Every structure is written in C-alpha cells, then in structure tokens.
UniProtKB/Swiss-Prot annotation:
It is found in: Cytoplasm. InterPro entries: 4pyrrol_synth_GluAld_NH2Trfase, Aminotrans_3, Aminotrans_3_PPA_site, PyrdxlP-dep_Trfase, PyrdxlP-dep_Trfase_major, PyrdxlP-dep_Trfase_small. Keywords: Cytoplasm, Isomerase, Porphyrin biosynthesis, Pyridoxal phosphate. The modification N6-(pyridoxal phosphate)lysine is found at K271. This is Glutamate-1-semialdehyde 2,1-aminomutase. Belongs to the class-III pyridoxal-phosphate-dependent aminotransferase family. HemL subfamily. Its EC number is 5.4.3.8. One of its GO terms (molecular function) is pyridoxal phosphate binding.
Length: 440
C-alpha cells in the first residue's frame, strides 16, 4: 500500500491548469481523448501509482514504456542515491558515461560502433537526420504516416503520398520548408516505397522508421517491409535510421533489431535506456558516428548529454535487463495477461483486436488488427472512450489514447494482472452486452 498521508494539500488538476498549458507538460497526459480527469500522481511503487486523492491505479502506461522494471525498483533507487552523492551533472565526460557505453556496445554485440548520448528521443532522431543529410549531402527524409519520432519540426508532418502523386514529388526539393523535405508514406506498403525510391532515391538522405509502430497503437510490420527499407537504403546510398526508442530492450534485449534480423545504419534508443531518467542515444558504425563534431564536421551538442545521474540509472536498468531469466519472466506475464483476453474476444465475437509484441499491447475496436495508420484510426473512438472510463473507474490505468501503446513491466504481479484482465474483459462485455456482467 502506498501512502500520501503526509501530504497537507490535495493538489488538483484544476490547479495544474493554472500553471501549465492544458494542465500538462505533454499533451496526451490531459486525457482529453478519453474524457476522464487526469490523475495527479503523488507516489509510485512497483506496478502501482497513487494519486493525490488517494486512489490506487495498476499502471500500464509505465512512463510511456520507460519503466520496464516498474516504479522505484530498489537497484535503480540505490543507483540514484549513490550517484547523487558524487554529483548530478558535470558538463564533462564522466567515468560512468564511458563504462555504460562500453557495456552497451559489448552486450549489443556491436563491433566497430560508437554511441552519442543525448537527453531525449527527439534529440537523437534530430541528430540522426542531421547526420544523414550531412553524410549524403542530400535533403529528403522519408518517414511513415503514423510513425512518431519526436517533436522536432524536421520530423513532424510531411506529405501523405499515393502512387498517383509520385510524379509531382520532385517539386518538393525546391521549396525551402522543413516539411517539404519530409515525405510521409503509408506504413507497411512496400509497393509505394519502391515507387518513391525509384523516383527520388538519389535525393533521399535517409529513411527513418519504427520497426514496430507504437504511436498509432501497436502496428506490427509485414514480413518483407522492414527488409525492403534496409535494402532500398543500401541500393540508393541513403541511411536507414531505425527508431527503437520504444522497442529497444523491451521486445527483446537487442530489441526489434534481433527479432527481425535487421542491420540499420543508425539505431535510436531511449526510454528504458535511462532507467526512468532522461537519456537517449544514437548508435552507428564509427564510419558514420565519427562525422559528428569534434571528430567530424556535423554539429550536435547538449548541456545534459550523457549526464552522470542518468548514465548511472540507465546502467543499472540495463544490467537488470541482463539478469538471468528476465525476459523469460516477462514472457510468462505476457501469456498470463493476453491469453484470457484474446480467448474472451474470440468466444464472444467482439469486434476488438488485442495487438501485442512482447510486453507492448493495444486494444483496437476493429474487426482485425490494423496494418497502417488509416486502419488504426478507424478504431471506434466512442466505444474506446466508454471502455476507458470503465477500466479507469476500476483502478486500471491504460495509456489515455486509442492510438498509444500500453506496457507490462517486470514489476506487475500476477494478482494485479489477473485483476486488470478481469476488468478489461468485463468492460468489453458491458459495452457489447450490457446484460452480461460478472464483476461489476
């Protein structure tokens, strides 16, 4: 049981709205797409957080995927306490920085590779794009509709392209707008990707992609799609940039790279990498990373890059991921949680899709699992809102958007997973058959 009894004043969301735009410091936290008042967290432990009204929630948001070990893991807390006594940020290279980078490259089996630490996934993807443009001396970046790579102007928006408009794409390079240099294509559509690269390949600096999409809900890749990205980049001399901010160290220790046997030019890590503190990294062969200053001529800098405290917590978090049986334990939790929900959906014939890869999952109110953003956004928003309110009112906190991912952590107990599972099942039953209720 968590305790906030020492709190003298119950801070409310209304107060947050007086000091933050929309009451939050990142938009989705406002819960506007699900119609509930956002909880204000007072403390968290394991798989539970407590809000300022004393309500306990089983947490499946997990710091948006950063907390694979749950909240306040003793070894991570100890790393913070021990490290903070030596300082928090030096603005200089630290011993911990070097040790952590060396351990990462070794454990990820990346020979002849280097790392550049930054403080956020946005910084990492922004730097990767700058590298791609600087190395190739080209301007165009390709991403995929529904894919999220941070909030830098260079990777937001873009052109939604179909085969009919390919002939007009060459005009893009003459328009001096960041978005005009970004082409957004449908995810999982190799045919359109091939057409665009045939037309513009020699002008494409790089292709950035999520191996498993996590910001249109969980959308899994078709077997050949990721291979096509890598092959086309090699063929046209473009850089392949794989964004594993969400999937890295989560779907497997070596991430989606291991699952799909991929060798991108640059890989982006974040979230789990920092152990709950702000840290991210771009990793690539030294022939690529050495283009960054001061070794090369491409600029990137950051006051907090590789800061001492985040390096120590990240080091502790990744070591925990390497502990014997860690991913086997996660697999057991996955099976315990997913299987009964999937069986209930099948047996009841609900038009709902539970999509999951490892400890990442999403519920779509659609007959079949989406394969791209257009299909994902066809999920029944009204039913999702009703569903979300039901689970929220019963102490289960899912990511507050139909197009966000949810996460299981190693801290989730079987008891809490079973409880959450029953709440999810009964919420679905309540929505589709109001006469059939087992737990409400």
């Amino acid at each position: 049981m968590l305790n906030c009894s020492n709190q003298k004043h119950t801070v409310t969301f209304e107060e947050a709205c007086q000091v933050f735009p929309g009451g939050v410091n990142s938009p989705v936290r406002a819960c506007r797409s699900v119609g509930v008042t956002p909880p204000i967290v007072s403390s968290a432990q394991g798989d539970i957080f407590l809000d300022t009204h004393g309500r306990e929630f089983i947490d499946f948001c997990g710091g948006w995927g950063a907390l694979i070990h749950g909240h306040s893991h003793p070894k991570i807390v100890k790393a913070i306490q021990k490290t903070a006594l030596k300082g928090t940020s030096y603005g200089l290279t630290s011993e911990e920085e070097i040790l952590f980078a060396t351990m990462l490259l070794s454990s990820l089996k990346l020979k002849e590779h280097k790392i550049r630490f930054v403080s956020s996934g946005t910084e990492a993807t922004m730097t990767a794009v700058r590298l791609a443009r600087g190395i190739t001396n080209r301007s165009i970046i390709i991403k995929f509709i529904g894919g999220y790579h941070g909030h830098a102007d260079t990777l937001l928006g873009g052109i939604s392209t179909t085969e009919e408009t390919i002939d007009n794409l060459t005009s893009l390079i003459h328009t001096p707008s960041p978005h005009s240099l970004l082409i957004s294509l449908p995810y999982n559509n190799s045919q359109i990707l091939h057409h665009v690269m045939e037309a513009l390949g020699p002008q494409v600096a790089g292709i950035i992609f999520e191996p498993i999409c996590a910001n249109m809900g969980i959308v899994l890749p078709k077997a050949e799609f990721l291979d096509d990205i890598i092959e086309l980049c090699k063929r046209f001399g473009s850089l392949s940039i794989m964004d594993e901010v969400v999937t890295g160290f989560r779907v497997a220790f070596q991430g989606a790279k291991d699952i799909f046997n991929l060798s991108p030019d640059i890989t982006i890590y974040g979230k789990i990498l920092g152990g709950g503190l702000p840290a991210a990294a771009l990793v690539g062969h030294r022939s690529i990373l050495d283009h960054l200053m001061p070794e090369g001529t491409i600029f990137q800098a950051g006051t907090m890059s590789g800061n001492f405290l985040a390096m120590a917590t990240g080091h502790a978090a990744i070591q925990l991921c390497q502990s014997e049986g860690f991913y086997d334990h996660l697999s057991q939790l996955e099976a315990l949680f997913y299987s009964p929900i999937e069986e209930e959906i099948r047996s009841q014939g609900f038009p709902v899709s539970l999509v999951h890869q490892g400890t990442m999952f999403s519920l779509f109110f659609t007959e079949s699992a989406p394969t791209n953003f257009d299909e994902a956004k066809n999920s029944d928003v009204e039913k999702f809102q009703t569903f979300y309110s039901e689970v929220f009112d019963n102490g289960v906190y899912l990511s507050p958007s139909p197009l966000e991912a949810n996460f299981i952590s190693s801290a989730h107990t079987e008891e809490n997973l079973t409880y959450a599972q029953n709440i999810i099942i009964d919420s679905l039953i309540k929505i589709f058959d109001s006469s059939a209720q087992r737990f409400f």
